[in-house]
Amino acid sequence: MKKNKWLLLVLCCICGFNAQAQQFVEDSIKVDGHMRRFDVFLPEGIKPDAPLVFYLHGYGGGIYRKNPMVETASREGFAVCIPQGLKDPKGKPSWNVGYPFQEGWKVDDVKSLSKIAAYVQKRYHLSRENTFLTGMSNGGEMCYLMAYSKQKAFKAVAPVAGLTMVWMYRDLEACKPIPLFEIHGTEDRTSEWTGDLDNKGGWGAYMPVPLAVGYWVAKNRCTKEETERVEGLNKENGHYIIKHRFTESATGCDVWLYEVVGGKHSTHTEDIKTGDEIWSFFKKTMKE
């Protein structure tokens, strides 16, 4: 009997250690009849009420655990939720941002992501006040759509290589200011820096990046622009970054735009420490 008790104790210790060492948790909830899958990254030693950052994949992508936010989270002590988009009418996992080929698709990703956020906050004891949203490409477009919406789940957004669709710019009026940070390459041929007002690329008409970001500068009533040029981390590719920071906002919501000169369609981790830069921006907005 004693031997069995000792064996049980040893097994409990081993299981407890493995549970503590496991940093990624697979989870899901049902929203509007769809199972919404996501992974949650919980760094070692994470504290109750820690911040939460959502990372959204690009068009056709999936749950990518090696995204720029995870490494930063492991050092800074915040959680990362990595959701999986549903398949659109073309059969590609994506976020419903109103591309022409998504017409008639009834998935409401604003609602779904808000529901996931509420669940993850409660289930993993994370901060409701300090939950943020970032994403790449199609995930970046979703960041803009979320910013325009009436959602209350996300305190700030940081699209990377993201676009504002013309329909958003013309038809939507943001109900409140929100801190926004865009990182974008000037040589991006998928999500053009100069926009695509004639829908030559097939994604739908979208705004030039500086003009799209300018909407939020005005909406947030920023009164000062600071500009800084820095060399990229990779000295061989010749890229450099112009950091446009729009500050002294009357609403307390700053806007940043990092113009990666020479940068293509990517997360720009060769040019800057993307995860650290995004976290630095989010951190400025945090509620203590």
Predicted features along the sequence, with ranges:
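Alpha/beta-hydrolase active-site loop
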Residues: 102-124
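Short beta-strand/loop motif that positions the catalytic acidic residue
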Residues: 182-184
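Cap/lid segment of the alpha/beta-hydrolase catalytic domain
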Residues: 85-108
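Bacterial Sec-dependent N-terminal signal peptides
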Residues: 1-23
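Alpha/beta-hydrolase
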Residues: 54-56, 83, 160, 260
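A domain-start/cap signature at the N-terminus of enzymes
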Residues: 19-52, 61-64, 72-75, 101, ...
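Active-site glycine-rich loops that stabilize anionic/oxyanionic intermediates
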Residues: 57-61, 263
